[in-house]
Regions:
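Metallocofactor- and cofactor-centric catalytic cores in central/energy metabolism, strongly enriched
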Residues: 2-8, 25-328, 334, 342-352, ...
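N-terminal chloroplast transit peptides
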Residues: 1-21
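Acidic/histidine-rich catalytic neighborhood
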Residues: 339
Length: 423
């Protein structure tokens, strides 16, 4: 696992809290109706006034500002006179939300709300996380990324290009918040199961960090979404006049690695060694390589490899406890051999070793099927990760035949790789 998970390095400690515990942020405001008498006035320690308040999503409360706050902040008359509590504003948003016919329209409503009233946005999300998570993140965020240029309203996050090498520290200094605790970064090359979306991949870091706040209580002003734009190999996007990223083929090799090296060091220099850097949706060729390169140097992890694996293996171990069974008694077949599958497989090997199973024997309990069939020794074009799980067996083309021959006790179909027709 990465430094954030495997070596004990965690987020920076806070006074009066255990090491790594972030203060829980809450968007909740007092519940008062339009004609309710607001509570006693409190000093408003802000330097911003007037439109700078109402147009700042971190400060804006919509019509929940009391009369005293409106007078102190110089916004009296800039918003309608009625006082609407956050509860009432939530009701209004929900009524409008439910009228939308498509999930993409619902996504746009929520993102627009996030851009103007952050407190209300997270109040909406936390009112029913199960309902809104599929809209803010998968699966709807994939559709939103595909239409990112068309639905683009306001920039959110930091856009770094391959041409910015040598200036990343300056760019990070342009970000208005200094106390960043979590960074989610992607280069847009493998967005969910949709392929190379280039700059449009920014929807992934934005959506993931919204869950950091809604589900984990991390202050949104301590979160930074980042898109590393090194070009795209998506010809459709390169021809699209609405595409807002770099319009050239992806840069690979030393120039790409130099950008990543500078980025990792610049983030650590700016925000500290305990700032968590989460990698999202990098292509397989880079994901494992960069994880192995940075995991013991920086506070980072790859969610597609390690995050998915930790949840999947935790579920397996929990099931074993219920059935009073041992992991070593099982044989696993994977449908798919991408980042998620490999991450789960590697963690299963670690769990088997913890039971006393030698590594060589542990790998023999894991059979992997990719788009070309069973991964076996001697098959051409196997990368390093696949070679580890290549079995000494004749080639088999279908999952059905693999199941018949191997007789597994468990079949695992990771997200984005599971072909349901195979089952």
């Amino acid at each position: 696992m990465g430094a954030a998970l495997g070596t004990g390095t965690r987020l920076a400690p806070w006074p009066g809290r255990a090491c790594g515990a972030l203060p829980r942020w809450t968007p909740t405001a007092p519940a008062q109706g339009c004609h309710s008498k607001p509570g006693p006035a409190r000093p408003v320690p802000l330097k911003k006034r007037g439109y700078d308040v109402t147009r700042n999503p971190h400060l804006n409360k919509g019509m929940a500002f009391t009369l005293e706050e409106r007078l102190q902040l110089g916004i009296h008359g800039l918003i309608p006179p009625c006082f609407l509590s956050q509860d009432v504003q939530l009701l209004r948003i929900m009524r409008y939300y439910e009228r939308q016919q498509s999930d993409l329209d619902k996504y746009i409503i929520l993102m627009t709300l996030q851009d103007r009233n952050e407190k209300l946005f997270y109040r909406v999300l936390t009112s029913d996380v199960e309902k809104f998570m599929p809209i803010v993140y998968t699966p709807t965020v994939g559709l939103a990324c595909q239409h990112y240029g068309l639905t683009f309203r306001r920039p959110r996050g930091l856009f770094i290009t391959i041409h910015d090498k040598g200036h990343l520290a300056t760019m990070l200094n342009s970000w208005p918040e200094d106390n960043i605790k979590a960074v989610v970064v992607t280069d847009g090359e493998r967005i969910l199961g949709l392929g190379d979306l280039g700059c449009y991949g920014m929807g992934i870091p934005v959506g993931k960090l919204a869950l950091y706040t809604a589900c984990g209580g991390v202050n949104p002003q301590q979160c930074l979404p980042v898109l590393l734009d090194v070009g795209t190999n998506n010809e459709e996007l390169l021809r699209d006049p609405l595409y807002i990223g770099l319009k050239h083929q992806r840069v690979h090799g030393k120039a790409y690695d130099d950008l990543l090296d500078e980025f990792m060091q610049a983030v650590t220099d700016k925000f500290g060694i305990n700032c968590l850097i989460q990698f999202e949706d990098f292509a397989n060729a880079n994901a494992f390589r960069l994880l192995n390169k940075y995991r013991n140097k920086y506070c980072m992890f790859n969610d597609d490899i390690q995050g998915t694996a930790s949840v999947a293996v935790a579920g397996i171990l929990a099931a074993l406890r219920i059935t009073n069974n041992k992991l070593s008694n099982h044989v696993f077949v994977f449908q798919g051999a991408g980042e998620a599958a490999m991450g789960i497989a590697h963690l299963l090997v670690m769990a088997l070793e913890k039971e006393g199973v030698p590594k060589a024997e542990a790998t023999r309990k894991i059979w992997m099927v990719d788009s070309k069939g069973l991964i076996v020794k001697g098959r051409s074009h196997l990368n390093h990760e696949k070679e580890m799980f290549a079995q000494d067996h004749p080639e088999v083309n279908s999952l059905e035949e693999v199941v018949r021959l191997v007789k597994p006790t468990a079949i695992i179909g990771p997200r984005d790789f599971c072909q349901w027709k195979s089952f």
